[in-house]
Each structure stands twice: as C-alpha cells, then as structure tokens.
C-alpha cells in the first residue's frame, strides 16, 4: 500500500467514524472513536500506548503491496453490510433483551489493529463470542472491521460456513490472520477452542486458553498488541456435565473432528445428550457480562520468537488477567442463568 493510499484510507476511516447510527443493522455508532488504552508494561519492561498509530500494521508497512491471500476469500472482506442490516433487529433484541448484554472497555482499544483474545462458552453456539462480534459492529460499523475465527468444521459446513464468511469470520490460520492485519482490521481469537467452550459447568467462570500459545507469536510477528477479553454468563446458556475426554479418545474424534472432547450436556429442549453439533440446543436466556481489558504490547524483536520462556510468561500473564476480570464479573451474578 502506498503512502498516499494509506493517508487517503485513514482520512476516509476517520470521517466514517464520526458518523452516527444506533442499531447493529445500521452499522455505525454515535459514540466517539475509542481512545487508546492505558499504557501497559510489556514483557521487555517498556511502556507503550495505542497513540494515534495508523490502522495498517507495522509489519504490513514493510511488505510489498497486496497480501499473499485474495482478500475476497475466507471472510477477509469483513462483515457484509447488507447482511448485518438485514439481521440487525434480531441481534439487537437478543443482545439487549434476551441476554441483557453488558459490555465495557471500548475506550481501552488501541487505535492500531489488535488481536483480541478471550474465552467463549456455551458449547458450539458460544453466545458470548457472538455478542462481542455483533456489539463491535454496533459500535464501529464499517469503519473498523473485526474478524471472528471459527473451527474448520464450522467454516467448511455448506450453509453455516458461508454465513460465517459473510460475517467476516475467518479460519484461524497464520496467513488469514496476517492478511486481516495487513488490511488494517482487528481479529479475535479464542485459543481454548473446544476445551474452552465445553468446559464443565462447575468451571464456567474459569479462563481456559488450553495451553495453546501460538497467538502470542502471531501478534509478535504482526507487530500488534494483544487485547484480553473477559466474559461470564455465556456458560449458563448450556450445562456441560462432562467434557467426555475418554469418550472422545474412544471415538477417535481427534482425527475425525480435531476435537479432544465428546461433551455430555443438559440443555433445552433435548435434555441430557452427547453434544457434537451446533443445533442440539436453544441457549438459555443467561445474562452476559463482558469486559475489554487494557492492551498488552509485546516485544517484537525477532529473536524473541524463539524465546520460549518469554512466550510462556506472556501467555500466563494474559490468562491471569482474564481470570481476574472474570472473577470480578462473576461476583455481580446473583443467580445462575437469570441474573
């Protein structure tokens, strides 16, 4: 991307952020553009803030124009405005009335692209994840695109996969995520995957990233900050009785579905069942509380990519921050599901 093109894009983005809309379907907000978050000390001891960095990543600035991937593939074009407008009324009702969503911390987002990392809950429908994506559209509209990520099984489903791509969802490969950053977009990851969304109900307020640390190096290579996201309530939409790890091994689900679990759930309207598909339950109307935390700026020195101790330390720090925030959010719950 040339300098003049980048400046023109930035001017266009700033202009679009000043416009106002209220609903998810309208795709704009009447709020001011979020400010850079409070400076956070990174692993190398330096303090940095979001500042007024351009949406294009530092890593992208050193690349030749164009991505290695066609931006029309795998949801890289971002959410389809027509689809978002068409389904906006439904999602507004779900967020505001059914799940009574509370989401805070917009002002902590840096102005530059970032990698959001959090937990998602409630089996394959993960309503806490969906509400973040839809609330993001309501907040920013087309001025700042967020790409969700989804398991290969969902992305390759004939109908569901196309719907996901129209929402801007991408498969969580390194190339896809880097291509999104190169466009100046944001990405959200849930590293825990099936270990996270199928954790038992008694662990519903536990941050599970599954020991999967690849996202740390992704952010380091791209030169983007990591923004942790904490949430509670989503795991009250479905009761996971057992993760079924032994059953998953017996059924060879690791090879068949890239899953280490075969969960047994209690849900409405099907009762107790082996839960392997997205359409086996209707989420209960649990109140969802979500908080966007301060950005964490990683050391982008290439030599750090091979520093396992540094990667481990940053992973533990991020997981701990999410857990502390989840504990605080859980204290507000008066009663499971309904409060």
Predicted stretch roles:
Residues 156, 279-339:
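C-terminal terminal-subdomain/extension
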Residues 115-117, 188-190, 291:
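Structural motif
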Residues 163, 179, 217-221:
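Hydrophobic/aromatic ligand-binding patch that stacks against planar heteroaromatic rings
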Residues 25, 35-176, 244, 320, ...:
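Membrane-anchoring hydrophobic helices of lipid-metabolizing enzymes
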Residues 1-39:
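N-terminal acidic, proline/glycine-rich, low-complexity intrinsically disordered segments
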Residues 193, 203-303:
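A cross-family acyltransferase "interaction/gating" segment
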């Amino acid at each position: 991307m040339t300098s003049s093109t980048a400046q023109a894009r930035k001017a266009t983005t700033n202009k679009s952020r000043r416009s106002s809309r209220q609903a998810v379907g309208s795709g704009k907000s009447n709020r001011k553009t979020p400010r850079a978050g409070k400076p956070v000390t990174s692993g190398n001891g330096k303090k940095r803030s979001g500042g007024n960095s351009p949406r294009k990543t530092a890593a992208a600035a050193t690349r030749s124009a164009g991505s290695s991937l066609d931006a029309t593939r795998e949801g890289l074009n971002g959410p389809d405005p027509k689809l978002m407008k068409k389904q906006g009324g439904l999602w507004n009702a779900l967020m505001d009335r059914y799940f009574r969503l509370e989401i805070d911390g917009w002002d902590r987002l840096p102005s530059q692209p970032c990698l959001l990392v959090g937990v998602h809950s409630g089996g394959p429908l993960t309503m806490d994840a969906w509400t973040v994506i839809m609330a993001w559209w309501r907040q920013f509209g087309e001025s700042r695109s967020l790409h969700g990520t989804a398991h290969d099984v969902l992305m390759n489903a004939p109908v569901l996969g196309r719907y996901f791509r129209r929402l801007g969802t991408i498969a969580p490969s390194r190339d896809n995520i880097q291509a999104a950053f190169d466009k100046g977009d944001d990405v959200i990851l849930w590293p825990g995957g099936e270990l996270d969304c199928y954790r038992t109900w008694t662990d519903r307020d536990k941050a599970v990233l599954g020991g999967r640390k690849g996202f740390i190096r992704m952010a380091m290579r791209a030169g983007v900050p990591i923004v942790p996201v904490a949430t509670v309530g989503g795991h009250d939409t479905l009761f996971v009785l057992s993760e079924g790890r032994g059953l998953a091994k017996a059924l060879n689900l690791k090879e068949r579905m890239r899953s280490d679990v075969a969960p047994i759930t209690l849900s409405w309207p099907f009762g107790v069942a082996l839960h392997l598909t997205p359409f086996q339950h209707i989420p209960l109307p649990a109140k969802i509380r979500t908080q966007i935390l301060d950005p964490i700026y990683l050391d982008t020195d290439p030599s750090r990519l091979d520093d396992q101790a540094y990667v481990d330390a940053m992973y533990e720090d991020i997981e701990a921050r999410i857990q502390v925030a989840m504990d605080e959010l859980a204290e507000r719950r008066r009663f499971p599901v309904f409060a």
